[in-house]
Amino acid sequence: MLTMDDIVREGHPALREVATEVTFPLSDEEKKLGRDMLEFLINSQDEDLAEKYGLRGGVGIAAPQLAVTKRFLAIHVHDEKDRLYSYVLYNPKIRSHSVQQACLSGGEGCLSVDREVPGYVVRSERVTIDAFDENGTPLKLRFKGYPAIVIQHEIDHLNGIMFYDHINKENPSYLPPDVDVFG
């Protein structure tokens, strides 16, 4: 079982590397790590397990956060209508994104960042993702709102980008007009 001790923190070089694509068939280790990542997210959202194991609540995690610079991630997040998006995605790519932008009212956080970083992180409000499941089956997935923000945050990790790289340095509280605000 993964715990917070397995997650690397900001400053670790894996968080700034561009991760390499996985090849199929996946190794048993890659499959297990993907499943363990999803299990971590599920456990972190369970109040009792989170307290017992000292887990910070998370809705997404990427392999580089575990010092594995390969292109896969897990998300376990509900949208505004309580629909669950629970996936382990290998080699995810953003196929298309909306012009409409969105952000979280309280900014973003990250399991690899142990401090609060104030500021808006403006992202696309909708994205379409091409990816593969652990068996190499191609997937085309659409996300909007909060789940779209989460998936973009995790894909950024695969490209060596941290959420705070998107914050306006001169004015972190600047919010461009017509941005949808969630949360």
From Swiss-Prot:
Swiss-Prot/TrEMBL catalytic activity: N-terminal N-formyl-L-methionyl-[peptide] + H2O = N-terminal L-methionyl-[peptide] + formate
Function: Removes the formyl group from the N-terminal Met of newly synthesized proteins. Requires at least a dipeptide for an efficient rate of reaction. N-terminal L-methionine is a prerequisite for activity but the enzyme has broad specificity at other positions.
MF terms (GO), sorted A to Z: metal ion binding; peptide deformylase activity
Protein name, as recorded: Peptide deformylase
Listed SUPFAM superfamilies: Peptide deformylase (SSF56420)
Enzyme class, UniProt record, top EC level: hydrolase
CDD domains the record matches: Pep_deformylase
NCBIfam families on file: pept_deformyl
Residues binding Fe cation, per UniProt: 110, 153, 157
Pfam families in alphabetical order: Pep_deformylase
